[in-house]
Amino acid sequence: MDNAALNQETEKLKAKLTAAELPAELKTKAEEMIGRLALMGEGQGYSNEYDRVSQYLNWIVALPWNKATEDRLDLTAARQILDKHHYGMGQVKDRILEYLATMSLTRGKAEAGRAPILCLVGLVGTGKTTFGPSLAEALRRKYVRIPFGGLGSALDLRGQSRLHPDAEPGLIIKALKRAGSNNPVMLLDEIDRVTEGARADIMGVLVELLDPEQNAQFTDHYLDYPFDLSQVLFVATGNNTKNVATAVLDRLEIIQMPSYTDEEKIAIAKQYMLPKVLAESGLSQDNLTIDESIWPKIVRPLGFDAGIRTLERTLDGVAGKIAKEIVGGGSKQFHLTAANIKNYLPDY
């Protein structure tokens, strides 16, 4: 590659950097990287170094350093959205509404309160993970989820140094890029399920993420420059707190998610789940009616279950069998009763 072509490549990098809105120190650092690249000329290793510098620039210009969404602090609208997606969960909803009220009263003031870091703890299927998107919708914030189940290294969260081949940022920075804003609702899902060997290191990163005195200067190893996470609204989930470090628990507001009673499951199935399942199966409410007397059989096909995942699978199975009969030329209206319910329940 001749000098003209080399100069053209580095000028493209400079133009990309100039157009980006970056912290001044980070921009200076990137300019120095481009300057060193230009000095390499046609020397050995130029191609690899160009790829590294170009990839780094692509990452830093894509991050939402100064981009934030504006919060909707309307308590009535927030309550309606939370109720639309979730039955019950009164303690969680009340805590969020309390925080929104505080934000509304302190907006623009020096004493503006920090977001509570909620940790929803409960058995499988009790609605922990689905609360994150609802909260984001209520606030009109972006939503991102980071799964901790099976996470095997703190470097997965914090990234690797650019000295390593194929280095890239960690899950936190990747989530911010996906969000496109610096104040998303970030769900840290199943923080109790990281691998045992990496637990101590991962808990150390969690302390930094969740501590308001530290997260304004969170440094990813790949970026090698601090990113302010203080505006992120973190929500964590876990099946229990046994495997969560005390230092992490100290920074969380633990909310226990109770098991659903049969009565609550029936209400959830009627109000939330059945309309959704019918729509996803291409059916309408005219296609299916269900006798009140058989709902207990639908919500408990295998005995007691704390969550609602089995219930959702059961309704999916019912809808699938009905859809098959309609497409096969059968009736278009079905009424489930004690006499025929066994024909539509899935075979477990």
Each language-model region and where it sits:
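Conserved catalytic/switch belt of AAA+ P-loop NTPases
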Residues: 188-228, 250
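AAA+/P-loop NTPase substrate/partner-engagement loops
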Residues: 138-168, 175, 195, 264
